[in-house]
Each structure stands twice: as structure tokens, then as C-alpha cells.
């Protein structure tokens, strides 16, 4: 074994091989660290919610909830860009082209920095007008703005971590991003208690704690890459990225970014409809959405695993392996749905009470109903997410983007037509209905992909 081969073996010793061996076993091994990472990343926001709800009350909880969709809009575009850049890196890794991989990293840093700064500036000037446009109740407007503006100023920190973690996952290493998040999540809990309960900083303390904790993740991730994963560090010659690769990175990242932001924009529109239903309804919905963010994690984690799996096997030229993998992912989504339905039927109201800290009947009733009505559609959501990510990984940039337009238009229709008539019941049914339409569309597009399903000669 040569010195170069030995070095590469050491560098990739934590990697899961997604291009060879048993498919489902490899997917699960790769997915589990992502699932645990997502769990602790969600704890950033959920710990905020629990402490805010229990220490500061329902009004402060509603303030954070009222800007939740805007937060997703701000961050979603940046995260989508990061995922798009990682897809290109995973293809290069699957093709075993180290030079292309390093040039991809160099181009990703340039595009990522520009995108995150743009998002931060847009949020800085547009957040207050957007909160007012969304008819945020006057009693929570100032707290909502105080929380979201701090989060906005930390977007670059969140983006930096997700890009770094995405590049590690692109080469099959999903373990180290988990380690960094475990450490920073513990810090986040300590800072939450200190800033909110100890120093009396209110909702601003929750936002500051989240940004600082995620900043620690960034530092740890960068130090690890510099010390142990030199293959992700471009040299001077790799700074000449080339127009073609820049375009591939730009178009892939913009497609993913727009897809995420259009979905988030639909959530902003839906939040407008929810804001008109009163503070207690907002509080109940906020608690339910926090719990939903936990229960759909197994689906999101597998969709992320599908993205890397499909990207690497696309780069390696293995369509049959992609077909088999996607079938197993669809079956996995069905199992997740069954488990979630059983859990929600038994414990939905107790979970809402635990997260919100509220004893108001309307808060508990609405939150529990949301969880019980949406959980039977989790199999559809799993198919939607994994197929959307797979199509992006196959180089489809426009057709998956169209699915997010369907979602946006569906939410607009519900806000204008159904929520005024059926109130919170329409809010609950909005997303399951949209999921069904999008899943049908995306599966049809996937079945027509010429690489995965080539026409017989």
C-alpha cells in the first residue's frame, strides 16, 4: 500500500460505504448519526420553547412561534444552498475524482459566503415590515422582532456549520457532525438557563444562546477538517474552479435554495392565517410544530441519507443500486408512519402540555389535534422528501423546484378560502393535502428519469 493510499484510508475510516454492500444496512448506518444530529439541532429551538413557555409564559411563547415561519424562510434558503453544494461534492466523491472534489469545495466556499451575507442583509432590513405585513399581534410584535433579528444576524454561523457538515457527509462521514452537535447542544441548554432564567434577558436570551451554541459547532467542525480530512481542503491550484463547475454549483445550490425558500414562504403565508386565530391558537400550534419537528426527523434524516446515497451512486454510474435503495426507503417511511400514529393516539395532549408549559384547554386541544390528524400522512411525507432529494441528486434542478411551487400555491388557497371558514381545522389539513399532490407528482417525475429508468432499446 502506498503512502497516499494509506493516508486516504485513515481519512475515510469513519465513512460508510454507500456504493457497495447491503443497501438498507448502509443507509441506516449513515442515517442514524444524521437523525441524532437533527434531534440535538432541534433541541436548540425546543429547549428555547420549553424554557420560554415555563419561565416567561404563553405570550412570549407565541412571540417566538409567530416568527417561526420567517425563521424557516431565512435559514431555509441558506440550508438549501448548502445541501445543493454538498450534492455536487458527493458526485465528485462517487466518481473518485479528488481534484474535482477539492475544486468543488473551493467554489462552495465562495458561493456559500456570498449567499449567507445576502440573506443576513435582506433579513436585517426586511424583518420588521414582514412581521407587520403578517399581522403579528401587537402584544407580541416587539418580542418577535427581538428574537428573529438576533437569529438573522447568526445565519452565517448556521450556514457555515451546515456547509461543513454537509461536505463531511458528502464523503460518507456522518459521525463527526454528530459529535460536534452533542457538545454544542449541552452548551445551549446551559446558556438558555443562564440568559433567560438567570440574567432575565427574555426571548433575546433564547436567540443568543442558540447562535453561540451553533458557533461552537462551526469552530469544532472546521478544526476537525483541517486536522484530519485534508481531502476537503483545496490547495492553491484548486482555487481555479472553472466556469463550468461554478455554474454547476450555482445552479444546483440555487435550485435547492429556492425550493427550500418557496416551501418556507408557503409556511409564512400559512402563519398569516394562523395569526388571525388568536394568541392561544398560535401557542398551541407552536408547541405542536415543535413536536412535529421531532416526529418527522426519521423521515428527514433518511431523505438526507438518500441525497448522499443517490449522488454517490449517480457519480459511480450505478442506476440499479439507486432503484433498489429508493424502494427500501419508501418501505421505511411506511414503518415510521405506523409507529408515529400509535404514539400520537396515546400521548399527543401530554406532549403538548410538556412542551408548551400551558394548562389552557385551547392550547392543548389544538396542539393534540394537529399531531393526531397529520401523523397518518407520514408515509406520504417520507416519499415526498426522499424523492425530492433523490431528483436533486440526479441533477434535476427545475422539476423538483416545481413541487415547491405546488406547495406554496396550495397554502395560499387554504389561507384565502378554507381557514376563514373552517379556522384551525383547515390549518391542520392544509399540509397533508399538499403532501399528497406533491408526492404523486415527484414519483411520476422520478419514474421518468432516464438514468435510473433507461428506456429499453
Language model segments and positions:
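Short alpha-helical transmembrane segments in multi-pass integral membrane proteins
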Residues: 1-31, 89-156, 198-254, 310-377, ...
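Small-residue-rich hydrophobic transmembrane alpha-helices
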Residues: 61-121, 158-177, 284-348, 381-395, ...
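Transmembrane helix-bundle signature of multi-pass secondary active exporters and lipid flippases
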Residues: 34-87, 151-158, 220, 247-313, ...
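Short runs within selected transmembrane alpha-helices of multi-pass transporters and secretion channels
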Residues: 82, 151-169, 177-185, 206-221, ...
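Membrane-helix boundary and inter-helical linker elements of multi-pass secondary transporters
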Residues: 54-57, 91-94, 170, 199, ...
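Alpha-helical transmembrane segments of multipass membrane proteins
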Residues: 46-49, 121, 129, 163-167, ...
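Juxtamembrane/transmembrane-helix interface segments of polytopic membrane transporters
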Residues: 41, 45, 49, 53, ...
Amino acid at each position: 500500500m502506498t503512502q497516499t493510499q494509506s493516508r486516504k484510508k485513515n481519512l475515510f475510516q469513519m465513512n460508510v460505504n454507500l456504493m457497495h454492500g447491503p443497501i438498507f444496512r448502509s443507509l441506516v448506518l449513515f442515517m442514524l448519526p444524521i437523525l441524532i444530529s437533527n434531534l440535538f439541532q432541534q433541541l436548540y429551538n425546543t429547549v428555547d420553547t420549553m424554557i420560554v413557555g415555563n419561565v416567561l409564559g404563553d405570550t412570549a411563547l407565541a412571540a417566538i412561534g409567530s416568527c417561526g415561519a420567517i425563521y424557516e424562510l431565512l435559514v431555509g434558503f441558506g440550508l438549501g444552498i448548502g445541501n445543493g453544494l454538498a450534492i455536487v461534492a458527493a458526485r465528485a466523491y462517487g466518481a473518485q475524482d479528488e481534484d474535482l472534489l477539492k475544486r468543488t469545495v473551493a467554489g462552495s466556499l465562495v458561493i456559500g459566503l456570498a449567499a449567507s451575507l445576502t440573506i443576513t442583509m435582506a433579513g436585517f432590513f426586511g424583518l420588521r415590515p414582514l412581521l407587520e405585513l403578517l399581522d403579528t399581534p401587537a402584544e407580541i410584535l416587539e418580542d418577535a422582532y427581538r428574537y428573529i433579528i438576533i437569529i438573522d444576524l447568526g445565519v452565517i454561523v448556521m450556514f457555515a456549520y451546515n456547509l461543513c457538515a454537509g461536505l463531511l457527509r458528502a464523503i460518507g462521514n456522518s459521525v463527526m457532525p454528530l459529535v460536534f452537535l452533542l457538545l454544542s447542544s449541552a452548551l445551549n441548554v446551559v446558556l438558555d438557563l443562564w440568559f433567560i432564567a438567570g440574567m432575565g434577558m427574555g426571548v433575546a436570551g433564547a436567540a443568543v444562546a442558540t447562535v453561540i451554541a451553533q458557533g461552537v459547532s462551526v469552530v469544532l467542525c472546521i478544526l476537525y477538517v483541517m486536522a484530519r480530512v485534508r481531502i476537503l481542503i483545496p490547495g492553491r491550484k484548486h482555487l481555479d474552479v472553472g466556469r463550468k463547475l461554478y455554474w454547476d454549483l450555482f445552479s444546483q445550490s440555487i435550485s435547492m435554495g429556492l425550493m427550500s425558500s418557496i416551501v418556507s414562504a408557503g409556511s409564512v403565508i400559512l402563519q398569516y392565517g394562523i395569526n388571525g386565530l388568536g394568541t392561544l391558537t398560535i401557542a398551541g400550534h407552536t408547541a405542536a410544530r415543535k413536536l412535529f419537528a421531532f416526529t418527522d426527523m426519521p423521515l428527514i434524516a433518511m431523505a438526507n441519507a438518500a441525497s448522499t446515497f443517490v449522488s454517490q451512486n449517480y457519480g459511480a454510474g450505478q442506476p440499479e443500486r439507486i432503484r433498489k435503495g429508493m424502494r427500501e426507503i419508501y418501505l421505511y417511511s411506511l414503518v415510521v408512519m405506523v409507529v408515529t400514529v400509535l404514539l400520537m393516539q396515546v400521548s399527543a395532549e401530554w406532549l403538548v402540555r410538556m412542551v408548551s408549559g400551558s394548562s389552557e384547554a385551547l392550547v392543548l386541544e389544538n396542539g393534540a389535534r394537529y399531531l393526531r390528524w397529520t401523523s397518518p400522512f407520514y408515509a406520504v411525507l417520507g416519499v415526498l422528501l426522499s424523492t425530492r432529494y433523490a431528483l436533486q441528486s440526479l441533477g434535476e434542478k427545475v422539476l423538483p423546484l416545481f413541487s415547491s411551487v405546488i406547495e406554496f400555491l396550495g397554502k395560499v388557497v387554504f389561507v384565502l378560502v378554507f381557514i376563514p371558514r373552517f379556522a384551525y381545522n383547515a390549518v391542520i389539513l392544509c399540509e397533508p393535502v399538499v403532501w399528497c399532490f406533491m408526492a404523486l407528482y415527484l414519483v411520476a417525475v422520478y419514474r421518468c428519469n432516464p438514468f435510473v429508468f433507461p428506456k429499453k432499446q
